[in-house]
A protein has these predicted regions:
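Bacterial N-terminal signal peptides
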Residues: 15-25
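Mature extracellular/passenger domains of Gram-negative fimbrial/pilin and adhesin proteins
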Residues: 2-5, 30-227
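Bacterial N-terminal signal peptides that target proteins for export
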Residues: 3-17
Length: 227
């Protein structure tokens, strides 16, 4: 049986940046080189002691909201935008015993007006007015072609309550698990990530968007895994 200290020594990390940018374009990329437009870049960090690695296989996708207008911001009510989904895959060179996902940073966290850990910021307008927030729903988790469960936990070495879907949280870890509560091992991990944006009311934006505004959020995710 592998001891906890051995598990910690064998822990490696993989990071990807997810950026919500510009006039409501969402770009997600696993390109290891910065894009010329500076939209999004993914970086891979592998600890020097390990020769085994994982990479993210994901095509860059952009989602334009061509009909966006100031009229979408209501006087007193929030307004939900249509959800957008894509599948994230993590492919490893060897079988890993546990794969987890955590939020490293939300660069627009200060624009979130509540304490909900599933809310991530879309940026400011009119000084300190809030443009809104978005959530990231995780579901359809798989190891290879086999469906598995998801969980959230505060301890990366423990498995939480198994769920078929959950919302990404700003603290703790999300992971893949088998029925029965053990971490799911494998070489190819995938999960659907659905982004659900909610625009603030004009009360929260501190008035009309006279000068216009761009949604401008950024999440950086880390994927610790154990060999």
């Amino acid at each position: 049986m592998t001891s906890r200290s051995q598990k910690l020594r064998n822990k490696t990390t993989l990071s990807v940046a997810i950026i919500w940018i510009g006039s409501l374009w969402l770009s997600i990329s696993a390109n290891t080189q910065p894009l010329l437009q500076g939209l999004v870049a993914q970086e891979l960090f592998v600890e020097p002691h390990s020769t085994d690695s994982c990479s993210i296989s994901m095509t860059e996708v952009s989602y334009p909201y061509t009909q966006l207008s100031a009229a979408l911001f209501h006087p007193t009510q929030k307004n939900k935008l249509p959800p957008m989904t894509q599948t994230l895959q993590v492919i490893c060179s060897v079988t890993v015993s546990q794969m987890t996902m955590e939020v490293v940073s939300d660069t627009q966290a200060s624009s979130v007006t509540d304490a909900d850990p599933t809310h991530f910021g879309l940026g400011h307008v009119n000084g300190q007015g809030s443009l809104g927030y978005y959530q990231v729903k995780l579901d359809e988790a798989k190891i290879g072609s086999d469906a598995v469960q998801l969980y959230h936990t505060a301890d990366e070495n423990a498995v939480g309550t198994l769920q078929s879907s959950l919302f990404l949280q700003s603290s703790g870890y999300q992971g893949w698990a088998k029925e029965g509560g053990s971490p799911a091992s494998g070489q190819q991990f995938s999960v659907n990530m659905t982004v659900l944006p909610t625009l603030s009311s004009l009360k929260e934006t501190h008035g009309p968007l006279v000068d216009g505004a761009n949604l401008n959020g950024e999440l950086v995710l880390r994927f610790p895994f154990s060999i």
